[in-house]
Amino acid sequence: MATRTQFENSNEVGVFSNLTNSYCLVAVGGSENFYSAFEAELGDVIPIVHTTIAGTRIVGRMTSGNRRGLLVPTQTTDQELMHLRNSLPDSIKIQRVEERLSALGNVICCNDYVALVHPDIERETEELIADVLGVEVFRQTIAGNVLVGSYCSLSNQGGLVHPQTSIQDQEELSSLLQVPLVAGTVNRGSSVVGAGMVVNDWLSVAGLDTTAPELSVIESIFRLQDAQPDAIGGNLRDTLIETYS
């Protein structure tokens, strides 16, 4: 399922939210439409946590995470950390990261298996990413840009990268990540795909300006046409097996 929404007239959905296969963070405040886009699809499946990070609402740019863990900058307050710990499943590791490049969502792009990171990220941060998120870490650029989290959107099914990424780069990144990639845009031609949308294995939410062709590229590369959350997919399969056995 691919949908569109806005956060207080901003189409940069990936700035104000962070979506994984086991939880979703959204900024506090904002309009009801923004939350209902997530709640309609995720409400019964994974927790949706309203929070600030380091006193700001740009939760998607300040954090990076996957189904195993969540990394937050060292400026995150104790109160915010406590709120996250209380709201997220116990299996999720939450870790403060002492990193000069503190907008972690801009410098890390990850799914449940691999992470692309800014070439200049600290060695300790690289180790934390591997440890907390349980992923292989690669220092990379995308179309010459060091902000890999801003110019790439990634799930376990596929990835969307900066429109100027060369075919050679796409093939190289695709073999590193072991998922198909396509170069494209969101929000009617914006190359900042990481900030313009969020995606997990069954849902993508992009900005309201995203055109129908852009949305169909998103649905196709992330294989969202008939994707179901694991929990629901499993239940349906069991029900069908019982019905026909």
Curated annotation (Swiss-Prot):
Keyword S-adenosyl-L-methionine listed: no
InterPro entries in the cross-refs: eIF6
Intracellular or extracellular location(s): Cytoplasm; Nucleus, Nucleolus
Cellular component terms per the entry's GO annotation: cytosol; nucleolus; nucleus; preribosome, large subunit precursor
PTM notes: Phosphorylation at Ser-174 and Ser-175 promotes nuclear export.
Alphabetized UniProt keyword annotations: Cytoplasm, Initiation factor, Nucleus, Phosphoprotein, Protein biosynthesis, Ribosome biogenesis
Protein origin, superkingdom: Eukaryota
Subunit (UniProt): Monomer. Associates with the 60S ribosomal subunit.
UniProt similarity note: Belongs to the eIF-6 family.
UniProt name for this protein: Eukaryotic translation initiation factor 6
Annotated gene: TIF6
